[in-house]
Amino acid sequence: MMRKLAILSVSSFLFVEALFQEYQCYGSSSNTRVLNELNYDNAGTNLYNELEMNYYGKQENWYSLKKNSRSLGENDDGNNNNGDNGREGKDEDKRDGNNEDNEKLRKPKHKKLKQPGDGNPDPNANPNVDPNANPNVDPNANPNVDPNANPNANPNANPNANPNANPNANPNANPNANPNANPNANPNANPNANPNANPNANPNANPNVDPNANPNANPNANPNANPNANPNANPNANPNANPNANPNANPNANPNANPNANPNANPNANPNANPNANPNANPNANPNKNNQGNGQGHNMPNDPNRNVDENANANNAVKNNNNEEPSDKHIEQYLKKIKNSISTEWSPCSVTCGNGIQVRIKPGSANKPKDELDYENDIEKKICKMEKCSSVFNVVNSSIGLIMVLSFLFLN
């Protein structure tokens, strides 16, 4: 049944696609034919118009040239008339006719001016002279006189007046004004300003100066003084204080601290050291001799039962109860176990079920050799809790995944 449905669907899809392609080909062919017809008609019309315009344009230009030639030469002297008579009756091509017309155009033209009515006209007279003009005009008059000039001009006017003077000048202006006055003076300046003011005053002076300021201020004051200085500073402060003192010093520091403290103290000391540590501990104890030297029992370096007991203790630590914290012995054994692989990253949890520890090297001790690491000051420890047994959980997860894959392969 499934095979029949698949064959039917594929056949239907191919049939519909074939119909669509046939329809598409027919439509594009029809559109192409109509487009070609339109292009042919447009091309023919444009070609006809272009040829017609070129033909009539050339004819019109040629006849216009002949007409202009006849118009220019119809009143010339007898040579031109003879040239026209000699050209009449000759059957020559258009090129010769055009050459003769061009020769006529190159001949000089005579000025034909309108003659005045009297018997002795001036051949150079201006034909546009006003017939009502004044016959007593000054021959030296300015030819560029303003025709709109004032006919009632002041005859006593200053001949040396400034031609660029302000026509809107104040008629009531002070005739005795200072000729050297500042032309860029402030028009809004204070008319009651102090005439004895300092001409060299600071232009950038503070406009908000305290009017009650001390007129006898210290002229040697520090110009770089702190503008945000404490106004309530201690007047009895030490004038010889250390200028390089720590600005972030603890304000609650012990004022009775030991002045003879060790200046070379360890800068990488453990900040989380036990505040209740034994103050009477042995200062000469060797922290690295716990399992070395000539110890007794299983601490002897060549004890054959030592590794057996350590492995047994490690197995017992792995089986630690969920409600118990990791013991010091468990921590020490785990540190020895991962001594060569410890780094600044947190190590895996020491147990797979229950409570364990994670350790790492403190960032300040990262450059120390691993043989010189101090477990108290250079190693950081924290407790980790494993709620599920990771080994059993991993086995169950792997089994379920394998079963699902096999079922999917064989059932299909």
UniProtKB/Swiss-Prot annotation:
Residues 337-390 form the TSP type-1 domain. Residues 85-105 have a biased composition (Basic and acidic residues). Residues 112-116 are annotated as: Region I. Residues 69-328 are annotated as: Disordered. The keyword Signal applies. Essential sporozoite protein. In the mosquito vector, required for sporozoite development in the oocyst, migration through the vector hemolymph and entry into the vector salivary glands. In the vertebrate host, required for sporozoite migration through the host dermis and infection of host hepatocytes. Binds to highly sulfated heparan sulfate proteoglycans (HSPGs) on the surface of host hepatocytes. Pfam families: TSP_1. Residues 1-18 form the signal peptide. It is found in: Cell membrane; Cytoplasm. This is Circumsporozoite protein. It comes from Plasmodium falciparum. It is a lipid-anchor; GPI-anchor. The gene is CSP. The N-terminus is involved in the initial binding to heparan sulfate proteoglycans (HSPGs) on the surface of host hepatocytes. The N-terminus masks the TSP type-1 (TSR) domain which maintains the sporozoites in a migratory state, enabling them to complete their journey to the salivary gland in the mosquito vector and then to the host liver. The unmasking of the TSP type-1 (TSR) domain when the sporozoite interacts with the host hepatocyte also protects sporozoites from host antibodies. One of its GO terms (biological process) is entry into host cell by a symbiont-containing vacuole. Belongs to the plasmodium circumsporozoite protein family. Residues 104-111 are annotated as: Required for the binding to heparan sulfate proteoglycans (HSPGs) on the surface of host hepatocytes.
